[in-house]
Design a protein with these regions (language model features):
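Intrinsically disordered, low-complexity acidic/polar segments
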Residues: 36, 49, 92, 102-104
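A short macromolecule-binding patch
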Residues: 38-42, 92-98
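Conserved binding/recognition cores within well-folded domains
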Residues: 1-87
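Primarily interfacial, aromatic-capped hydrophobic alpha-helices that serve as membrane anchors
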Residues: 97-107
Length: 107
């Protein structure tokens, strides 16, 4: 967490994506092929360097995503782009125009 009182140890390749929720982040990951999530009191800014060092990329102001788990990028009729992940029970992750080229280049 932000005060370094709590740590969660996950293999970076098990992390599918991270989403921001006010003063918290929710980490979505796979454990023994089952989808799990963990809420941590932290900001996206505080996690950014750690995420980038471990292969996650920012795809939206509120999301980091692991390119290893992206199955496809899909553009909706409204023009919104979503990353579909390889675990079907997880939601689609939005990819903003600002980060679309970066995410696309990693696929």
């Amino acid at each position: 967490d932000e005060k370094h009182n709590l740590k969660i140890v996950l293999a970076s390749d098990s992390i599918q994506y991270i989403s921001a929720e006010e003063n918290y982040v929710r980490i979505y990951y796979l454990e023994h092929a089952k989808a799990r999530n963990y809420v941590l009191r932290s900001s996206m800014k505080a996690l950014e360097e750690l995420c980038l060092e471990n292969g996650l990329v920012r795809c939206h102001r509120s999301y980091f995503i692991n390119p290893q788990h992206i199955k496809t990028l899909r553009k909706e009729q409204e023009g919104v782009v979503y990353a579909e992940l390889d675990a079907s029970e997880l939601q689609h992750v939005p990819v903003s125009k600002r980060y679309l080229d970066t995410v696309s280049a990693l696929l």
